[in-house]
């Protein structure tokens, strides 16, 4: 068996894991451990096509999950083939523009950036520490891949906020973006799709899932992206509000008497599609009930969602200026599967000569890629499944093998 990479994506209460062959992209194992610290902590996995699941024990967390993976799921052959471990890290601040091997200095850098990702970075550090314990022979073969790295090519005019400049220089307050690993992967997929070298492709990439972001790529490099200092800015998301008037925070605090904790919970966990429907954060509810007159919240939510998305796409078309736009790409759970969202958003962009092909749009779902615009559309729109795990595996292999 060839050299394999174990990929870990640690959240505060969950752990996604996979084992990939970085040379072929073949997935040997995938799984999810969830409900950490709760009585129902559990783990499920798929190994060589066979599915399994187990209880981890009440209160179990990252340590128990990784120990279970190493002791109960991995075969000896698979365990011996793991040559390195790749970790997804949400925020690397300005310091990290590419993936790096884990050192004490890197751990310190992840800790420093935790102020901008307080839920994610501390959990990632737990994952690194527990990986050291579970696989001690691979301690110098751990690699971190940053969601923010791809966006570090943005210029000041794109990443600065119109705040006192000292807030940036002294405290790092600026746009960082997120989903960079996915945006990077899709930019390369677009290049292959349109037959151009990766360093010459110009694209607008819409990563739409429970979280969502748009980036604009010129000559293979990100020049702007919708998420900001944190992943709260930008698009309407599952539970996150995206762009709002900052003075709304003052209003909620001063006039409605909400605490800062309540305001944060509202903007991060109670807004977006959940806030607009007041039912669910699941986009499928809004799609399924879009024309149901008894559930007007569905149409309201999907219209606001798609309108915001169209605004970003249009703005980024302007940002490209004279550079030819090779494609608008849709990826992520919603981007890959919601023909309705794509149709609503692109129909706002008829001014640019974009024409959606309804049959192609409906065909490009459920894992199928494809162009969804007509042959005479001024610009192509493409659906492309993302593969962040493959990027992590390949970066890890590049640094360790």
UniProtKB/Swiss-Prot annotation:
Compartments where located: Cytoplasm
For this protein, the record's PROSITE patterns field holds:
ACETATE_KINASE_1, ACETATE_KINASE_2
Name of protein: Acetate kinase
A single GO CC term for this protein reads: cytosol
- Organism name: Haemophilus influenzae (strain 86-028NP)
Gene behind the chain: ackA
Binding sites annotated in the UniProt record for Mg(2+): 9, 388
Site, Transition state stabilizer: residue positions: 179, 240
PANTHER family in the cross-refs: ACETATE KINASE (PTHR21060:SF21)
Keyword DNA repair attributed: no
Q: Which UniProt keywords apply?
A: ATP-binding, Cytoplasm, Kinase, Magnesium, Metal-binding, Nucleotide-binding, Transferase
Judged by the first EC level, this protein's enzyme class is transferase
Q: What biological process terms from GO does the record include?
A: acetate metabolic process; acetyl-CoA biosynthetic process
A molecular function GO annotation:
ATP binding
The superkingdom of the source organism is Bacteria
**Principal location listed in the UniProt entry:** cytoplasm
The UniProt annotation places ATP binding at 16, 207-211, 282-284, 333-337
């Amino acid at each position: 068996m060839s050299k394999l990479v174990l990929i870990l994506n640690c959240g505060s209460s969950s752990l996604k894991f996979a084992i990939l062959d970085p040379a072929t992209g073949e997935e040997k194992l995938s799984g999810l451990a969830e409900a950490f610290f709760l009585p129902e902590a559990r783990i499920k996995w798929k190994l060589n096509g066979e599915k399994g699941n187990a209880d981890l024990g009440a209160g179990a967390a990252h340590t128990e999950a990784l120990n279970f993976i190493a002791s109960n799921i991995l075969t000896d052959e698979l365990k011996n083939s793991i040559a390195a471990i790749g970790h997804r890290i949400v925020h690397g601040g300005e310091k990290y523009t590419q993936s790096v091997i884990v050192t004490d200095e890197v751990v310190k850098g992840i800790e420093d950036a935790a102020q901008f990702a307080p839920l994610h970075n501390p959990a990632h550090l737990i994952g690194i520490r527990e990986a050291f314990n579970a696989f001690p022979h691979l301690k110098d073969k751990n690699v971190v891949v940053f969601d923010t790295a791809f966006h570090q090519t943005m210029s000041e005019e794109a990443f600065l906020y119109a705040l006192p400049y000292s807030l940036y220089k002294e405290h790092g307050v600026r746009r960082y973006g997120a989903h960079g690993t996915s945006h990077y992967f899709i930019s390369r997929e677009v290049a292959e799709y349109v037959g151009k070298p990766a360093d010459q492709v110009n694209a607008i990439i819409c990563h739409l899932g429970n979280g969502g972001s748009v980036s604009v790529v010129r000559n293979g490099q990100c020049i702007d992206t919708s998420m900001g200092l944190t992943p709260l800015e930008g698009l309407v998301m599952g539970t996150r509000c995206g762009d709002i008037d900052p003075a709304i925070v003052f209003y909620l605090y001063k006039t409605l008497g909400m605490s800062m904790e309540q305001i944060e919970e509202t903007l991060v966990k109670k807004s977006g599609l959940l806030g607009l429907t007041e039912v669910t954060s699941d986009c499928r509810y809004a799609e399924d009930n879009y024309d149901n007159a008894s559930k007007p919240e569905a149409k309201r939510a999907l219209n606001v969602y798609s309108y915001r998305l169209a605004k970003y796409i249009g703005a980024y078309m302007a940002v490209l200026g004279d550079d030819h736009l090779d494609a608008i790409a849709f990826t992520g759970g919603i981007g890959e599967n919601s023909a309705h969202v794509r149709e609503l958003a692109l129909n706002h962009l008829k001014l640019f000569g974009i024409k959606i092909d309804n049959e192609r749009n409906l065909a490009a779902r459920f894992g199928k890629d494809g162009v969804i615009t007509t042959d005479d559309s001024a610009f192509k729109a493409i659906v492309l499944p993302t593969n962040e795990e493959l990027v992590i595996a390949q970066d890890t292999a590049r640094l360790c093998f």
